[in-house]
Amino acid sequence: MTMRLPPLPTIGELIRLFGLSAKQQLSQNFLLDLNITDKIVRSSGDLTNKTVIEVGPGPGGLTRSILKAGAKKLVVIEKDRRFLPALEVLRHAAGNIDGSPWEEAFLTKSEMDAKRYMSYAPNKSRMQIVMNDVLRVDEQEILQHIHAPIDSNDKTQWENMAPITIIGNLPFAISTELTIKWLKQIQGRHGAFRFGRAEFILMFQKEVADRLIANPGTKQYSRLTVMTQQLCSVKKLSDIPGSAFVPKPDVDASLVSMVPRVTPLGVNVPTPTLEYVCRQVFGQRRKMINNSVKTLGPEAEILLARAHIDPTLRPEQLTVPQWCDLARAYQQWENKPQWAPAL
């Protein structure tokens, strides 16, 4: 699909366009090098028949590369209204799905809430903008106007990959919270996953990416590791130096692919239960687990026997299936303390 996209603004132009100081404006660490953004999009494979959800497009560096790659449909989710002018220019250039000229398809959050937005926006527009906090957005509300949902009880439908890819240079401050939101959606097969197994191509702080791919027994192995690997196959695609971002952050970043598993590792326990058990027990990761597990309540050592876990292991040595077994034992524990949260 051929189109003419405007050039990326310089840093000075960004500051003038949005009327902000460099320190305030650039705290979001933009990727403005099209060689890098093109490489990220190539990692996503063929997008010509896919809907892409881009998280946090900012001024549109990665957005441009997604459009250039020929994505059939692009929905960008952006919280900061200061980026609207840049994104609207891109939407105008993108036109409609059928190649016809663009028509108005944007409504501000002040005009309608996120749930109403998509019912007003013409579906034929190739690029659509959702002005909202991605932590609060229900992707199902967006995608139901584009794709038909699968039967969540039909294993065969879940085995097939959805024609949806989620791409984003995630704000470091919310990357863990956002990942957990998506994991809960994967398990419940709602949100974007109401339509099948959608792949993620995401930029994380390198430290977080290393936790996502970690193995048992390493210092990076953590609660986030267990929760993510239970439900997704995770692979690091590349490391990207901090110098590639504007402004340069104090840390490097990594590009990660996450693909929902057809069948979860270990027993399938509710994500909130697994999260709670991991959070409590990983808090004492260097102690033997027969001591660490006591953070779940008095006499919680019985859970180790029920889960067939060696009590002399340390939390960081448990495999993902073993963590799932422990969470299931906790879920079924008849003597959970009264102060335990409802999960």
Curated annotation (Swiss-Prot):
Sites where the protein binds S-adenosyl-L-methionine: 28-31, 56, 78, 133, 169
GO terms, biological process: transcription initiation at mitochondrial promoter
Main subcellular location of this protein, as a coarse class: mitochondrion
Example of a GO cellular component annotation carried by this entry: mitochondrial matrix
UniProt keyword terms in alphabetical order: Methyltransferase, Mitochondrion, RNA-binding, rRNA processing, S-adenosyl-L-methionine, Transcription, Transcription regulation, Transferase, Transit peptide
Family matches, as Pfam families: RrnaAD
Signal peptide: none
CDD domains membership: AdoMet_MTases
GO molecular function, one term: rRNA (adenine-N6,N6-)-dimethyltransferase activity
Superkingdom of source: Eukaryota
Entry EC number(s): 2.1.1.-
Subcellular location per the Swiss-Prot or TrEMBL entry: Mitochondrion
Top EC group: transferase
Function: Probable S-adenosyl-L-methionine-dependent methyltransferase which specifically dimethylates mitochondrial 12S rRNA at the conserved stem loop. Also required for basal transcription of mitochondrial DNA. Stimulates transcription independently of the methyltransferase activity.
Family: Belongs to the class I-like SAM-binding methyltransferase superfamily. rRNA adenine N(6)-methyltransferase family. KsgA subfamily.
Protein name: Dimethyladenosine transferase 1, mitochondrial
Phylogenetic placement of the source organism: Eukaryota, Amoebozoa, Tubulinea, Echinamoebida, Vermamoeba
